[in-house]
Amino acid sequence: MIEITAEIRAFIDKVAVGVELAEDEYIDPSDGLIHCKKCGGQRQTVVPCFGKSGYFMPRCICQCQQEAEEQRKAAEERKRRMERIKRRKAQGLQDRYLYDYTFANDNGQNPLMDKARAYVENWKEAYKNNTGLLLFGDVGTGKSFFAGCIANALLDRDVPVLMTNFPTILNRLTGMFSEDRADFITSFDEYDLLIIDDLGVERSTEYAMEQMFFVIDSRYRSRRPMIITTNLKLAELKNPPDLAHARIYDRILERCAPILFAGKNFREENAGATKQAAKDIVNRKSE
């Protein structure tokens, strides 16, 4: 700010005549400029007219206004972020039940869940180093829940994640022309993390194996991490039955660290609880 000389002060006082003030403003007698009643900061300044004589007095923002503007922008960004997360969840979690696969819904019975939390907390490193996971083990041991918790936690952090399976992918590819299929597979690169659930449940036709290879190979070449869940044994993955499977499994094993799920069958336990709840309902007498 320039020094308020007698000449400038005379100019200020002349301009100030009849000026309209907001309710939270006043003219400070010490400099004749508009100030904020709350913080006392200037809302007006004096600037020389370069190239010619004279001055002009533009408005400026005080600390209160600056803070209010920052809060407004922060609120807008939070709103945009929440809307973006909502859209990404709708795109990335295509099955509604996956929304319930969260750390908040973890019953604490699977000690491997600490590894899922660690993966999320160290996501930046995992992404940078293209570190994926291979979750293998018997049916119902919590592999999909483990992967879903990671997906939801990262989506809540505004990380693009897609959790899908090969039957769904193959169904989408059916009827597409070759160029459309290539574009569809390439679209997976828009996601920082790709989760393929239940590898091995799809039909092993020549067409299916070819499309599966294209998906895994595209991900492999993009150097972006993926998480694979499967009921196959690690020995089956390391000793595939043919070249078509070998090309897929080799890429997965190179990029994904294996984690064995060998615990109890949570689905059987949940089914038992469901049966008991149903029994309680149907046997309950009307009041």
Task: Give, region by region, the residue ranges found by the protein language model.
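Pre-Walker A (pre-P-loop) alpha-helix and adjacent loop at the N terminus of AAA/AAA+ ATPase modules
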Residues: 93-133
